[in-house]
Amino acid sequence: MNIFEGNLVSEGLKFGIVVGRFNEFIGGKLLEGAIDGLKRHGVKEEDIDIAWVPGAFEIPLIAKKMAKSPKYDGVICLGAVIKGSTSHYDYVCSEVSKGIASVSLESGKPVIFGVLTTNTIEQAIERAGTKAGNKGYESAVSAIEMANLLNTIG
């Protein structure tokens, strides 16, 4: 029996990060967490590229462009969609999650869903570096682990 697991050694790995600018205060905190997570695990600053997009809905397209590039071992998608009084929230959340999953499956690379989908701004703030941790950091660690797991499996 073979058991495969990814590790958190990231020397030589390169990552793209796509961040939605809408709710930029939250996206910026998630980005800080992701960069911190990558650097703490050995990714060099020059091996991190960041693309800002207008909002969460635009994330999958740029994630796809990065994932198709041989330059990147993985892509981290960050942003925040906060529920409002209309059904727009439901459509955006659904399409962003489907789009990111599709990019990962099509590219064969880890494309990590680090987009917060919350009912309130307070919930988003909690998940962007306060009492619920930083989902950007967690997404970066997931990207490292998945990139290594894919490399291990071959």
Swiss-Prot record:
Pathway: Cofactor biosynthesis; riboflavin biosynthesis; riboflavin from 2-hydroxy-3-oxobutyl phosphate and 5-amino-6-(D-ribitylamino)uracil: step 1/2. PANTHER family: 6,7-DIMETHYL-8-RIBITYLLUMAZINE SYNTHASE (PTHR21058:SF0), 6,7-DIMETHYL-8-RIBITYLLUMAZINE SYNTHASE DMRL SYNTHASE LUMAZINE SYNTHASE (PTHR21058). Keywords: Riboflavin biosynthesis, Transferase. Catalyzes the formation of 6,7-dimethyl-8-ribityllumazine by condensation of 5-amino-6-(D-ribitylamino)uracil with 3,4-dihydroxy-2-butanone 4-phosphate. This is the penultimate step in the biosynthesis of riboflavin. This is 6,7-dimethyl-8-ribityllumazine synthase. Pfam families: DMRL_synthase. Its EC number is 2.5.1.78. CDD domains: Lumazine_synthase-I. GO terms for cellular component: cytosol; riboflavin synthase complex. It catalyses: (2S)-2-hydroxy-3-oxobutyl phosphate + 5-amino-6-(D-ribitylamino)uracil = 6,7-dimethyl-8-(1-D-ribityl)lumazine + phosphate + 2 H2O + H(+). InterPro entries: LS, LS/RS, LS/RS_sf. 5-amino-6-(D-ribitylamino)uracil binds at residues 22, 56-58, 80-82, 113. The lineage of its organism: Bacteria, Bacillati, Bacillota, Clostridia, Eubacteriales. The gene is ribH.
